[in-house]
Regions:
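Short, charged N-terminal beta->alpha structural module
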Residues: 1-25
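FMN-binding flavodoxin-like domain, especially the glycine-rich phosphate-binding loop
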Residues: 23-27, 33, 38-135
Length: 135
């Protein structure tokens, strides 16, 4: 079973997760302060302010980075080089592979690409696997 850990502020990541879980049946867990994490999985978050990682996401990573296989982020291309920058920062700071970036709540093409990446690259992968940055 694939587990997805996500943080959503405006609802874009929530909508993305809803579509992914409806298609796949994967388990989604909304990040909450001090939540226990028993199963390893994939992080999906958003970029806030001007290319920053959300505080709740950052706290989650400090507590559970050893159980995160990959990171993906929602963003807005209007922010230019800051688009989805949270994923880049998390990938770099925690040595987690960057799976993908998607705009706002993602298109169906984004949803299918994410599912394909997780199924074929990161399902049951070992941490420390070679980074795949296709964002």
């Amino acid at each position: 079973m694939v587990h997805l850990y996500y943080d959503s502020r405006t609802g874009n990541v929530q909508r993305f997760i809803n579509k992914v879980t409806q298609i796949t049946g994967w388990q989604a867990h909304k990040i909450e302060p001090e939540m226990p994490v028993e199963q390893p999985g994939h992080l999906i978050t958003y970029t806030t302010k001007i290319g920053c990682v959300a505080d709740k996401t950052l706290a989650f990573m400090h507590a559970h980075a050893d159980k995160v296989f990959s990171v993906s982020s929602s963003g807005n291309r209007n922010w230019g080089p800051n688009y989805g920058l949270a994923a880049n920062k998390i990938s770099h700071d925690f040595d987690i592979p960057l799976a993908m970036k998607f705009e706002l709540s993602g298109t169906m093409e984004d949803i299918n690409q994410f599912i394909d990446i997780i199924k074929n690259q990161y399902n049951d992968s070992k941490r420390g696997s070679q980074k795949l940055d296709i964002a």
